[in-house]
Amino acid sequence: ALATGAQPLQMQPERHDRLVALTSHLPYLLACSLVAAVEQRGNDDPGVWDLVSTGFRDTTRVAASDVRMLSDILQTNREPVRAALGQQRRALEALEAALDGDADSLQAALSAIRATRQRHFPPAPAENE
């Protein structure tokens, strides 16, 4: 693991399962759900696939992961994954509420999220523009 740049962490198994459900398994499910949503729209209007961007491709990259392996991981960690899905559902509901509010509320919510991401993943100079 060290040869690949990984930093080993010691923690209780239950904590590990909760955290990777949120940071690894949930992103996989979100990528899958995004592809499924566009596919569903594509059934009515195949032109939707002509409009997907590199952002869509990047965001959904993990949806191309090994299904058998991920299915096993999801089944093994079912309860932590369900909890992560609930947490994500609440985050989406908060964004939906911000969207229903005024422009300032939406911008404030998105700015706070952007700041959190940049705090954990500082942008490269070109990304800051």
Annotate each language-model stretch with its function.
Residues 30, 92, 96-99, 117-124:
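A structural signal for well-ordered alpha-helices, especially hydrophobic packing surfaces
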Residues 38-41, 101-105, 126-128:
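Juxtamembrane/interface motifs at transmembrane-helix termini
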